[in-house]
Structures are given as structure tokens and as C-alpha cells.
UniProtKB/Swiss-Prot annotation:
Residues 558-628 are annotated as: C. GO terms for molecular function: ATP binding; ATP hydrolysis activity; ATP-dependent protein folding chaperone; unfolded protein binding. Molecular chaperone. Has ATPase activity. Homodimer. The gene is htpG1. Pfam families: HATPase_c_3, HSP90. Signal peptide: none annotated. GO terms for cellular component: cytoplasm. Residues 341-557 are annotated as: B. It is found in: Cytoplasm. This is Chaperone protein HtpG. Belongs to the heat shock protein 90 family.
Length: 628
């Protein structure tokens, strides 16, 4: 270690840390007990990490393989100490783990806070505050740590005001000691019974023993003795019988594995025996974490082998579209030295993943069927992620599709409550397709001119405005034998929903307007693939549609916004022969004026579907000329 690092240094927190600390102290003050839960949870993680690293290097245990967490307090000094003999931290790890919040989206998260204490408490809980929660009850925190395998210790200290000090320290053994110097008015925590009841309430399920000194009554007060007692049950909750676990225990264990403040929506606890032996305890959260849409973020499944922690972001155990699932899988078959590479090619893991996915889908189906209000909450939080499923998981495509919910013209609100099953139950007699439209906003979808004939005939259309919807409909082309059909692509063929007389009249109109169609095509040139008469419009003069096998206008815009190349397919302009503007066009003989009218029709249709004009100045000039 260089001489520079052997002296005391004062370093500044990241700006976001400073802001978060202040917000947290105010927002979470009513839930002070979570401080102990968070710090014990971190100590438990440190022990898990030591066990895992010791699989490759047993010498890391030294002479101390009996892992535990110790909680003590000092009434005179007004301190609480949480100690563990886990992995410990090096100086660099202290800076990275405690001086920084190494999470993408931190600024955005902070901007989303409202100033409403109850709401902000939930948001901060979703963010996961961990160590920083200490400052809710402490005005100074001292952390002394020594990494397993190292002889050097480091002391970190801060009042949470904006900077912290780091200096070399003396520590006889590996692990971490955290001393909380309590704020004025927090003396309720300097009480043996209070601390033990908090530990039993929040941390009973921690697999490590959490020890405190036994206390006895002496001179009218409780005083600690020299004898240790284990405060928690210290057994793997998931390994116990379901009938022995209370709802509260399940909920507290969820908060431990997920670092969430809210109770989960539902969970599934299973012991599998036979070809593979494993236990799974899987939870569906009730709130989405702030970084849900970051596909690179850590997954939420902790993998254990025979109760030994292996890793806490085992992405091989759950597909991307279920990345919100939290929980534990404990296998009896995998080798203890299992690596990520082995996991990628393990048949056992593949079988566990397949079964776990089915379990999660069953949980969701059960919610949707028996607790629709709860499922509506789930959908609001995680629906857009579930929509990634049909494109990722071919084997379960139909089951996932059955869980999807959409807005539609049935209620004409942006609430996504319509399932494919609901839609099919309301289909018109003779209707063969499930109709939908994609757009970049609900308003654009709801007011699209493409819906006019469907509204007139009372045919329901799904209104898809999430970015993921384009990806969804490209991979989900039918449901329950019914084709999914975009109302903005290809020829409009309503099949049996139109009678022969209507079709006959349409054919006559197309023939009558053929010369006008050809003139508009000539005026627009390469801007369009084709011009044709439409019967999908009742109020608008024109609309743009994509060819049956072309990208929709909305998808093309999404890809361009993401910086991706597009095939550059041209749209089809459809004109409404019953509209006054189109009828007047037939009588325009001035070719320059006619060309302006044709371009205006095209530009208006482009704007109506949410597109951007290539030449806004030319559009304004033409509009001004018409108004003059």
C-alpha cells in the first residue's frame, strides 16, 4: 500500500448519495426498525460471499469457520454495533460500495420523488437503500472492515453530511463492524428486549445465527451477561415445511431477498423430488423496481446448492421477461463449485428453469383468474415486461399471450384491462381476426383515422401504444386460432362483416376514381408506394397504410429513434372517395395546384398517424397558399 493511502483521507460522497441520505432520513423516519434489518441483511450477504469464495480457497476461513452476526449496544456511549465475520472489504471495495451508489438511473430516480413522505418512502424502498438506512437513527456511523485473506483493515466514518473519512485501522480478524452513534431521542434502541424483538420480527429467517449477550435482571434493570444466545431461528426458511411457515415469515423473507419494503403480491414454495431435487421459493413483487427496464440489471434469483449460497443474480434460472421475479432456488444436484459457465450448459439448470417458468406463469394465471384486482395491480407494474415474453419464450407463447392485457375501443380508456379471451368473446358474428393498431401514444391510437370504419361497424380494435407492442405483434401472430391483424397494414378485408352489395359498390367506386388515383400517384411520385381508394375511412380524407409485409410507420419511427437502419419501405396513400376534399380534387385542372393538394393530403395523413414531415416549410407554404 502506498504511503498516500496510509493516512486519514476525507472524500466526498457522490452528489446523488448526499441527496438520497437527506431524503431517506425524512421519508423513512416512521419505519426506523428497518435499519437493523438492512444491516443484518448485508452482514448475511457478506457471510454468503465468504462461503462462496472459500469453495475455491478454504484458507480464507483462517481459524474461524463458525460464521455469525453479533448485535450489541452500549448505553453509556449510546451506540449499537452490528458485527460479522463474513468476507469483509478492501479499501477500494469500501469506496465503491459505500462512497458511491453504482446504479444507473439514480438521478432519474431522485427526480421522481414527490415530496409526499408516504409515497417517497415506497419509492426509496424500491430503490433499495441498504447500508445508508443507518443514518435514519444515527448521526455518525463508523465502519471498520478487513477483507478475508488480507492483513490490512480500513476505517470508514461519516455523519452523512456530504463527505466521509477513510483511514487504516487495526482489526484482529476478518469481517465488518458497524457502529451506529445514535441521534438524540433514539434511546429506545438501547434496550435488550427491543433489539431482540426487532431481530425476531425482521430477521428470524436469516440462516446465520444472530447472537446477543443474554441478559438478566439485576437491581431492577436488565443487564447483559457474558453468555451468548442466538436470537433468531437461524435455519433456511425455504427448507422448512410450508405448514410451519407463517404468512408474516414468508413476507419478511421476501423483504430480505429482495431488499424491498413492500409485501409481495404472491409467492410459490415448492419442493421437487425425483430426477432433480431442488426447492424453489418464488415471489411476485407488488411494486416494480426503478430499474426494471434495464435488461442488464441483476436478476432476482439467489442460487444455493445444499444450503450453500452460490450467486445472487442467476440469470440462467429465469428468462428476461420474468426478470421481476424474486426468490431462492436451492439444488441438491449441482456441484458446489458450479460456475456461470457450467450453469449455461447444465441440463439440470435447464430443467429447473423450465419448471420455474411454468410455476411463475401458473401463479399469474391464478391471480388473473381468482384475484383480478390483484392481477390488475401486477399488470400496471410489470405488464410491459411480460409483453417481451412471446418473442423470447416460444414454448410458453400461448400461455403468456393469455396473460396479456390491452386497452381497446370497447372502453376507449387507456386502462389495459382487455385480454384476448375477452376480445374473442365480444367478436362479431363472422369476424375472423383480432384487430389492433399500434401507435406511439394512446391518444394517437385512439384517434387514428384507420379506426373509422371499425367504429362505424362496432368492431372492437385493440389500442397498442407501448414501445414493446411492435415487438410483441411481430412475434405473436395469432391467438386461439384467430389471426392478429393490423388495421393499418395491407388491404382492408372485413370478410363476412361486409355484405355483397357493399363490396359491389366499392368496386364501382374504385373504377370511377381510377383517373384521380393515377393523377395523385403521378404528383406524389416516389413519396408513396401506391395510391388507392379506401373504404376504411368515414370522416378523414386520407390515411397512410403499410404494405402487408412492410414495417408499420410506428415501428419504422421507433427503429430510427434507436439509431437503427430501416429498409425504407414507402407507405400506401388511401383516399376517401366520399370526402369533400377528394371530390373537389377531381375538378382541379391546374396541375401545380393539384400537386399542392395531393402533397397536403399526404402530409396530413402522415401527421395523423404520428409521423414527422420531411419538409415542414413546404407544408406551411402549401397551407398558406390554400388559405389565401
Amino acid at each position: 500500500m502506498s504511503t498516500e493511502t496510509l493516512q486519514k483521507e476525507t472524500l466526498g460522497f457522490q452528489a446523488e448519495v448526499k441527496q438520497l441520505l437527506q431524503l431517506m432520513i425524512h421519508s423513512l423516519y416512521s419505519n426506523k426498525e428497518i435499519v437493523l434489518r438492512e444491516l443484518i441483511s448485508n452482514a448475511s450477504d457478506a457471510a454468503d460471499k465468504l462461503r462462496f469464495e472459500a469453495l475455491a480457497d478454504n484458507s480464507l476461513y483462517g481459524n474461524d469457520s463458525d460464521l455469525k452476526i453479533r448485535v450489541s449496544f452500549d448505553k453509556q456511549a449510546r451506540t449499537i454495533t452490528i458485527s460479522d465475520n463474513g468476507i469483509g472489504m478492501s479499501r477500494e471495495e469500501v469506496i465503491n460500495n459505500i462512497g458511491t451508489i453504482a446504479k444507473s438511473g439514480t438521478k432519474e430516480f431522485l427526480q421522481s420523488l414527490t415530496g409526499d413522505q408516504a409515497k417517497d418512502a415506497n419509492l426509496i424502498g424500491q430503490f433499495g437503500v441498504g447500508f445508508y438506512s443507518a443514518f435514519i437513527i444515527a448521526d455518525k456511523v463508523t465502519l471498520t472492515t478487513r477483507r478475508a485473506g488480507s492483513n490490512e483493515a480500513v476505517r470508514w466514518e461519516s455523519t452523512g453530511e456530504g463527505d466521509y473519512t477513510l483511514e487504516p485501522a487495526e482489526k484482529e480478524s476478518r469481517g465488518t463492524d458497524i457502529v451506529l452513534h445514535l441521534r438524540e431521542g433514539e434511546d429506545e434502541f438501547l434496550n435488550d428486549w427491543k433489539l431482540k424483538s426487532i431481530i425476531r420480527k425482521y430477521s428470524d429467517h436469516i440462516t446465520l445465527p444472530i447472537v446477543m449477550k443474554k441478559s438478566e435482571w439485576k437491581d431492577g434493570e436488565q443487564v447483559p451477561t457474558d453468555e451468548d444466545e442466538t436470537v433468531n431461528k437461524a435455519s433456511a426458511l425455504w427448507a422448512r415445511n410450508k405448514s410451519d411457515i407463517s404468512e408474516q415469515e414468508y413476507q419478511e423473507f421476501y423483504k430480505h431477498v429482495s431488499h424491498d419494503f413492500e409485501n409481495p403480491l404472491t409467492w410459490s414454495h415448492n419442493r421437487v423430488e425425483g430426477k432433480q431435487e431442488y426447492i424453489s421459493l418464488l415471489y411476485i413483487p407488488s411494486k416494480a423496481p426503478f430499474d426494471l427496464y434495464d435488461r442488464e440489471r441483476q436478476h432476482g434469483i439467489k442460487l444455493y446448492v445444499k444450503r450453500v449460497f452460490i450467486m445472487d443474480d442467476a440469470e440462467q434460472l429465469m428468462p428476461q421477461y420474468l426478470r421481476f421475479v424474486r426468490g431462492v432456488i436451492d439444488s441438491a444436484d449441482l456441484p458446489l463449485n458450479v460456475s456461470r459457465e457450467i450453469l449455461q450448459h447444465s441440463k439440470d439448470i435447464e430443467a429447473i428453469k423450465t419448471a420455474s417458468v411454468k410455476r411463475v406463469l401458473s401463479m399469474l394465471e391464478d391471480l388473473a383468474e381468482n384475484k383480478p384486482e390483484e392481477y390488475a395491480k401486477f399488470w400496471k407494474e410489470f405488464g410491459r415486461v411480460l409483453k417481451e415474453g412471446p418473442g423470447e419464450d416460444f414454448a410458453n407463447k400461448e400461455r403468456i399471450a393469455g396473460l396479456l392485457r390491452f386497452a381497446s375501443t370497447h372502453a376507449d380508456t387507456d386502462e389495459q384491462v382487455v385480454s384476448f379471451k375477452d376480445y374473442i368473446a365480444r367478436m362479431k358474428e363472422g369476424q375472423e381476426a383480432i384487430y389492433y393498431i399500434t401507435a406511439d401514444s394512446f391518444a394517437a391510437a385512439k384517434h387514428s383515422p384507420h379506426l373509422e370504419i371499425f367504429r362505424k361497424k362496432g368492431i372492437e380494435v385493440l389500442l397498442l401504444s407501448d414501445r414493446v407492442d411492435e415487438w410483441l405483434v411481430s412475434s405473436l401472430t395469432e391467438f386461439d386460432g384467430k389471426k392478429l391483424q393490423s388495421v393499418a397494414k395491407g388491404d382492408l378485408d372485413l370478410g363476412k362483416l361486409e355484405d355483397e352489395a357493399e363490396k359491389e359498390q366499392q368496386k364501382k367506386t374504385e373504377d370511377e376514381y381510377k383517373p384521380l388515383v393515377e393523377r395523385i400517384q403521378a404528383a406524389l411520385g416516389d413519396s408513396v408506394k401506391e395510391v388507392r381508394v379506401t373504404h376504411r375511412l368515414t370522416d378523414s380524407p386520407a390515411c397512410l397504410v403499410a404494405g402487408e409485409h412492410d414495417l408499420s410507420g410506428n415501428l419504422e419511427r421507433l427503429l430510427k429513434a434507436a439509431g437503427q437502419k430501416t429498409p425504407g419501405s414507402k407507405p400506401i396513400l388511401e383516399i376517401n372517395p366520399d370526402h369533400g376534399i377528394v371530390q373537389r380534387l377531381k375538378d382541379v385542372t391546374d396541375e401545380a395546384k393539384f400537386a399542392d393538394w395531393a402533397h397536403l393530403l399526404f402530409d396530413q395523413a402522415l401527421l395523423a398517424e404520428g409521423g414527422q414531415l420531411e419538409d415542414p416549410a413546404a407544408f406551411v407554404r402549401r397551407v398558406n397558399a390554400m388559405l389565401a
